[in-house]
A protein has these predicted regions:
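Gram-negative bacterial Sec-dependent N-terminal signal peptides
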Residues: 1-7
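A residue-level marker of the well-folded mature domains of exported/periplasmic proteins
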Residues: 7-224
Length: 224
């Protein structure tokens, strides 16, 4: 029966390349799913991707297996999802950081990153003693630029004479998982006088926050 089918449907979550223990975006999703399982007694399927090609494969595999809903973490799932979702009209899909797909069985979850970052910028601007603050982004995409722009606007709101140094880690998905590069960028920013750093960089942010702690400056993290 229909009700039996719904009762048996198991949700699935597909983590992005950082993996579910990235101390950031994916791990937050995993902890939320785990909490759901603990509170309801339910179970969920999961997979950690090893490479880009697996996105569509994992989506199709879970959909074929009857998983419902299928949740994805990250904008890189937009293209594979736009191909797969129409083939499984009875499956519900949800994807974080994608809000431009108009498909009846897809729920996009987007955020006003610039607004929260504006408040973060105000904090940074008020806390800085040098008048120089910095930002480390992960992959250079519009989403992360929204973080950076909101932050800079917030800094300027409390200190119009402040300097904001902004760096992106890279232009490929590897930029989310490069704590060594995050550390190097932070050291360079500190050498230019930055005494508050804001990271919106996934696993790369671990390197930013650790370096800030080691060097004795303030840091602000997000998505973790």
């Amino acid at each position: 029966t229909m009700s039996a089918g719904i009762a048996l449907a198991e949700p699935a979550i597909i983590f992005d390349l950082g993996g579910k223990f990235d101390k950031s975006f994916n791990e937050s999703a995993f902890l939320g799913a785990k909490r759901w399982a603990d509170e309801t007694g339910g179970t969920f399927k999961e997979i950690e991707l090893q490479n880009e090609a697996q996105r569509e494969q994992a989506l199709r595999r879970f959909a074929e297996a009857g998983a419902n809903p299928i949740v994805m973490t990250g904008f890189s799932f937009a293209d594979p999802l736009s191909k797969v979702a129409p083939d499984y009209p009875d499956t519900k899909f949800a994807v974080v950081d994608v809000n431009w797909l108009s498909l009846p069985n897809v729920r996009g979850i987007g955020f006003n990153e610039h607004e929260g970052s504006y408040l973060v910028g105000m904090l940074a601007g008020q806390s800085s003693k040098t008048g120089i603050v910095s930002f480390v982004g992960g992959m250079d995409i519009p989403l992360i630029r929204r973080f950076a722009c909101g932050y800079a606007q917030g800094v300027m709101a409390v200190n119009p004479n402040a300097t904001v140094i902004a760096n992106m880690t890279g232009t490929t998905p590897a930029a989310w998982n490069d704590p060594v590069k995050g550390s190097e960028l932070t050291k360079a920013q500190i050498s230019q006088g930055a005494d508050v750093v804001y990271a919106a960089a996934g696993g790369t942010g671990v390197g930013v926050l650790q370096t800030a702690a080691d060097e004795g400056i303030l840091s602000i993290g997000v998505d973790a």
